[in-house]
Swiss-Prot record:
Organism lineage string: Bacteria, Bacillati, Bacillota, Bacilli, Lactobacillales
Membrane-spanning intervals of the chain: 17-37, 58-78, 108-128, 141-161, 174-194, 220-240
Signal peptide (UniProt feature, chain positions): none
Species annotation: Enterococcus faecalis
One Pfam family in the UniProt entry: ABC2_membrane_4
Subunit structure: The complex is probably composed of two ATP-binding proteins (BcrA) and two transmembrane proteins (BcrB).
Name the UniProt record assigns to this protein: Bacitracin transport permease protein BcrB
């Protein structure tokens, strides 16, 4: 299994997709910097802290920018075997399809964790630049570190909810369909981000869970978590079932 993950990572070293994904998630820190500058000049009486910026960034990470990028890298990671026609050379080697999929899912998780860390560090760095020029209340590494577990947990939740898009990537053998599907899902997430029903929509429920808003919706926490797990499990099952039954021509 470690050899499979190592092989997947070595293939990514030669891919421009890694740099593209890093550049993509860095748009979140830049958006937070722009928002901070706008607040500073338009409403100078408002005092905000580093913790406030991290809190506001959760919306962009869980519902908008990062979620779409994570779906894109998931689609790329799985569809590339079809576009590059490498499955026929991989599967004759004594590697089961199940192990191959598990290796890819582990690689996807590592990639998402890496991008989540880049986002977290990027916010701290751009806030540092703001702090040097304007002074930011509560700017310290300890505050940033206190947000790291929440960011990583959010990354894991987003990894779980990418499984249906992985199935779409396998089913269509392409990159475009899962990305289009993610755009539709993101629009739904944004529409429900201020609605109580968002607790029942798995891609919004992950945001509510990280933001601590599940209880305020009136729905049980266990129900929201159960929906997230159910959608994730269905996505994983359909992916494994389809790939194991697929006839490679």
């Amino acid at each position: 299994m470690l050899n499979l993950i190592s092989c997947e990572l070595s293939k990514l070293k030669r891919s421009k997709m890694v740099l593209i994904s890093v550049a993509g998630v860095l748009s979140t820190p830049l958006l937070m910097l722009i928002e901070a500058l706008q607040t500073h000049f338009d409403k100078p009486e408002i005092i905000f802290t580093l913790s406030d910026i991290y809190s506001d960034s959760v919306l962009y990470i869980m519902l908008l920018v990062n979620m779409m990028i994570y779906v894109a890298i998931a689609a790329y990671l799985y569809s590339r075997e079809y576009t590059e026609n490498t499955l026929k050379t991989i599967l004759p080697i004594p590697i089961s399809r199940t192990k191959l999929l598990i290796g890819k899912f582990c690689t996807l998780l590592l990639w998402i964790v890496m991008l989540t860390l880049v986002t977290w560090a990027g916010i701290f760095i751009v806030c540092g630049l703001y702090h040097v020029v304007f002074t930011l209340e509560g700017y310290s590494l300890l505050v940033a570190i206190s947000w790291l577990p929440k960011f990583l947990f959010g990354g894991i939740l987003m990894f779980l909810t990418t499984s249906p898009f992985v199935f779409i990537a396998f089913k269509t053998k392409g990159f475009v369909a899962p990305v289009i599907a993610s755009a539709v899902i993101v629009m739904g997430s944004v529409a429900l981000s201020n609605q109580e029903l968002g607790a029942l929509y798995p891609w919004t429920a992950t945001f509510f869970l990280i933001d601590g808003r599940i209880e305020s919706t009136g729905y049980p926490l266990a129900l929201a978590i159960g929906i997230i797990i159910l959608v994730s499990a269905v996505g994983f099952f359909m992916t494994f079932h389809h790939f194991k039954k697929e006839d490679l021509k």
